[in-house]
């Protein structure tokens, strides 16, 4: 190659290399002003955020059946220029939405499913279901996508105007209550090109953590099916082989074994099928187990013990047993660099200004539940995140754990609910379509927007998060999925329950063209307490 050409190419390469940092440096100088503008823009969208919170609350869909919710969110995203891929990992309600070009790729996730039998009128501080026995948002999963979509729309406007490189990716936590989706996303490489994952989850404060989970577990969700042979329960019971007997013996065996397991394990089961009627020996019976532990090896051991006990129960009853994994969740590990950056933004945003009505509702609900403390909503931020040095004695699980082992991940906890509630309960739905949830979601959207700007305009933060991911988080632990290549999502779950309740629930879907809020549509005076309701009826 001639010397002049080589020299020209070298000069061009040097200039090209220099231009990118200079451009990014120029944009990063604007970061404080862009952050201030982002906060203002989120505030301008607070009515939109409120509508999303209320609409998804009114759908109240159980895991794998979140059709209305996914249709609603993806319609909004398409209308705002996002491309949407549906049916991700074989799940009809799973999707991935993208906008932008190039790196970094920032993925926003939040769960969308609800809780069985948790139907509840919002803003009412005692049990008063919208529809008796119907599902409802008794964990508050109606709020997180409103946080993410609001932040994404604000960021899109700023990125377009400022010509900021990067890609925004939004996705739903489908069937989180069944731990049914995110392990499949991880297995199938949905996050393979992602630079950082910002997940959101409802809480009673603004907060973020890093490092190994201090009070949570991973799990494997397993369905055991026993097959026997039927017979007349009175006329010829000796000719039958009871699958239900096998289920009961498995449960008894597991319950005796509990004493000899680690303190950090948690396990629970429900009998899905115990037979048809008493005078027929059950030829088929099914039990569903969650085996929880604080690390992969001990989750696997619990699963193996459960399998042995199931086989023993089958031998005792002369039945056959098979099992299949319905879902799984790895223990969570969150990114220190991103968490510290996010906490700086949390301090900048601060907690919402709660009204007297907000506090009245919170305190009344706490009294209704018999709580020792009835101090209402939090008015002080959580402490800065720090590495937990104590022992993890177990707790709940979230399949965001699997995602956290595929890319640097954090979970933003935002203040849309009331402190000290039971969880998975009608009480956790009381605040979730009220000003408490609306204000908390707006605060969360601000933190998400600010932290994403940090990642977009500070390449060093992305580099640090990956260094932590590889050198600290992955130093001694390597992710191994509980799923095989043949395992498929359990999309049959909750189908019959939703088919039963959805026709009646449709009558109560929020209509923002006629009503400003869901409270207004339902005719609820905010807040409604036992005392105020009693006065109204006198």
Task: Name every feature range the model reports, one short phrase each.
Residues 56, 97, 108, 141, ...:
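Divalent metal-coordination and catalytic microenvironments
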Residues 245-538:
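Metal-dependent amide/peptide-bond hydrolase catalytic core
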Residues 1-12:
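Bacterial N-terminal signal peptides that target proteins for export
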Residues 10-23:
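Bacterial N-terminal signal peptides
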Residues 127-136, 142-143, 160-282, 292, ...:
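Histidine/acidic-residue-rich, glycine-tolerant segments that coordinate divalent metal ions
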Residues 43-47, 63-71, 142, 146, ...:
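Soluble non-cytosolic domains of exported or imported proteins
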Residues 28-137, 146-167:
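Acidic/His- and Gly-rich active-site-bordering loop/insert found
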């Amino acid at each position: 190659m001639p010397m002049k050409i080589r020299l020209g190419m070298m000069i061009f390469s040097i200039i090209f290399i220099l231009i990118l940092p200079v451009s990014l440096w120029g944009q990063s100088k604007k970061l404080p002003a862009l952050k201030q503008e982002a906060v203002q823009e989120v505030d301008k969208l607070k009515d939109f955020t409120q509508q999303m919170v209320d609409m998804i609350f009114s759908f109240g869909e159980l895991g794998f059946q979140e059709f209305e919710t996914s249709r609603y969110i993806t319609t909004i995203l398409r209308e705002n220029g996002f491309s949407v891929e549906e049916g991700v990992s074989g799940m009809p309600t799973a999707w991935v939405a993208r906008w932008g070009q190039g790196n970094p790729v920032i993925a926003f996730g939040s769960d969308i499913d609800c809780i069985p039998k948790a139907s509840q009128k919002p803003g009412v501080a005692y049990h008063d279901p919208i529809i008796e026995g119907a599902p409802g948002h008794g964990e508050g999963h109606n709020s997180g996508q409103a946080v993410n979509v609001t932040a994404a729309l604000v960021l899109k406007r700023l990125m377009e105007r400022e010509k900021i490189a990067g890609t925004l990716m939004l996705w739903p936590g489908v069937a989180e209550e069944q731990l049914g989706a995110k392990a499949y996303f991880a297995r199938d490489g949905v996050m393979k090109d992602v630079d950082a994952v910002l997940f959101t989850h409802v809480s009673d404060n603004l907060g973020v953590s890093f490092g190994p989970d201090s009070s949570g577990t991973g799990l494997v969700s397993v369905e055991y099916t026993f097959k026997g042979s039927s017979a007349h329960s009175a006329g010829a019971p000796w000719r039958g082989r009871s699958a239900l007997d096998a289920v009961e013996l498995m449960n008894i065996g597991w319950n005796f074994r509990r004493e000899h397991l680690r303190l950090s394990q948690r396990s629970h089961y429900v009998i899905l099928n115990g037979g048809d009627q008493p005078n027929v020996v059950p030829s088929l019976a099914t039990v569903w187990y969650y085996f929880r532990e604080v690390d992969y090896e001990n989750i696997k051991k619990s699963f193996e013990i459960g399998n042995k006990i199931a086989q023993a129960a089958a031998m005792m009853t002369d039945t056959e047993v098979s099992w299949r994994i319905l879902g799984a969740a790895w223990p969570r590990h969150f990114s220190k660099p991103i968490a510290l950056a996010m906490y700086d933004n949390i301090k900048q945003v601060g907690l919402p200004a709660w009204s007297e009505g907000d506090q009245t509702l919170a305190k009344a609900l706490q009294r209704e539940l018999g709580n020792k403390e009835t101090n209402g909503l939090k008015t002080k931020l959580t402490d800065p995140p720090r590495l937990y040095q104590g022992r993890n004695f177990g707790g709940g699980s979230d399949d965001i754990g699997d995602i956290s082992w595929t890319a640097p991940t954090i979970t933003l906890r935002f203040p849309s609910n009331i402190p000290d509630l039971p969880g998975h309960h009608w009480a956790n739905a009381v605040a979730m379509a009220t000003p408490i949830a609306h204000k908390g979601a707006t605060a969360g959207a601000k933190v998400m927007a600010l932290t994403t700007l940090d990642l977009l305009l500070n390449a060093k933060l992305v580099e640090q998060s990956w260094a932590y991911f590889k050198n600290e988080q992955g130093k001694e632990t390597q992710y191994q999925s509980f799923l095989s290549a043949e395992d498929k999502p359990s999309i049959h779950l909750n189908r019959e329950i939703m088919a039963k309740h959805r026709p009646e629930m449709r009558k109560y879907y929020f209509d923002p063209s006629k009503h400003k809020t869901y409270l207004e549509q339902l005719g609820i005076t905010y807040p409604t307490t036992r005392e105020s309701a009693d006065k109204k009826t006198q």
